[in-house]
Swiss-Prot record:
Protein name per UniProt: Phosphatidylserine decarboxylase proenzyme
Gene Ontology biological process: phosphatidylethanolamine biosynthetic process
Modified residues (Pyruvic acid (Ser)): S226
Membrane topology: Peripheral membrane protein
Subunit composition and interactions: Heterodimer of a large membrane-associated beta subunit and a small pyruvoyl-containing alpha subunit.
Pfam name, any one: PS_Dcarbxylase
Species whose genome carries this gene: Bacillus thuringiensis subsp. konkukian (strain 97-27)
Keyword Lipid biosynthesis (UniProt): yes
Signal peptide start-end: none
Record field: catalytic activity: a 1,2-diacyl-sn-glycero-3-phospho-L-serine + H(+) = a 1,2-diacyl-sn-glycero-3-phosphoethanolamine + CO2
Cleavage (non-hydrolytic) (site feature) positions: G225, S226
């Protein structure tokens, strides 16, 4: 019953009109009135902001803010995989040979997430990692490794919450929501960076258009908090053992090690 009621309420409020109104408000000068309250409620660290608080003219500008130079360092070890965002580490684990994985008691299909069987097959037997971005986090997304961009594509039309309630009662939001995917070939092995849209505000803006990408390079930004899913091929990485669900991560922090292949 809870699941049914939850989904009904989301469907009734999560329409194009609602999304349009919220987006227009966030981009308007009128939204600047609530910026101080927003910063206070979500405890945003003003010392890290590239600009002073009064220089942000709209909520959208605050959502997509940059950091001051030097506030994040990218792990330089050639074998390291780094966190592409500031966020909360949600989970990691194996991708089954059936191209599925389980998180929070819900099974997700990589075929659904990536749109077809051919893409999903690359990651059978591999590893997934999920990082959640709240409204308080820095919303820009960077590359976790260096390599060649092999594909960029967008899937899904609407987005549902990716918070605790959304993960429990929603319709597989990580693989059904509006999402933007970038696949990178790094030394012959593939990684998929899946940027999952948030409810009401689907917008994910791509900033990187070149054929190659460097570890730590800026790739995109969310216009609100959301989630990033990383998919790695089989035997490509070993996740840092100290990582725990609920742990805060910072952009550039080492989250996994590339496995050496003879």
């Amino acid at each position: 019953m809870r699941r049914t009621l939850y989904r009904l309420m989301i469907e009734l409020t999560n329409g194009r009109f609602t999304s349009y109104i919220l987006r227009k408000f966030a981009q308007s000068r009128l939204s600047s009135i609530i910026i101080p309250s927003y910063v206070k409620v979500f405890q945003i660290n003003q010392d890290e902001m590239e600009k002073g608080l009064k220089e942000y003219r709209t909520l959208h500008e605050l959502f997509t803010r940059k950091l001051k130079e030097g506030k994040r360092s990218i792990d330089t070890d050639a074998s390291s995989i780094v966190s592409p965002v500031d966020g909360v580490f949600a989970d990691y684990g194996p991708i089954e040979d059936a191209k599925t994985f389980d998180i929070k008691g819900k099974r997700y299909s990589i075929v659904d997430m990536l749109g077809n069987e051919e893409r999903a097959q690359r990651y059978a037997g591999g590893t997934y990692m999920v990082i959640y971005l709240s409204p308080s986090h820095y919303h820009r997304i960077h590359s976790p490794l260096s390599g060649s961009v092999t594909e960029r594509f967008v899937l899904g039309r609407k987005s549902y919450p990716v918070n605790a309630a959304g993960m429990e009662y929603g319709k597989e939001p990580l693989s059904k929501n509006y999402r933007s995917v970038t696949e990178v070939n790094s030394d012959g092995e593939h990684m998929a960076l899946v940027k999952v849209g948030a409810m009401f505000v689907n917008s994910i803006e791509l900033l990187h258009e070149r054929d190659t990408v460097q570890k730590g390079e800026e790739m995109a930004y969310f216009t609100f908090g959301s989630t990033v899913v990383l998919l790695f091929e089989k035997d490509m990485i070993e996740v840092v053992q100290e990582l725990k669900s609920g742990q805060e991560l910072r952009l550039g922090e080492k989250i996994a090690t590339r496995l050496a292949h003879k």
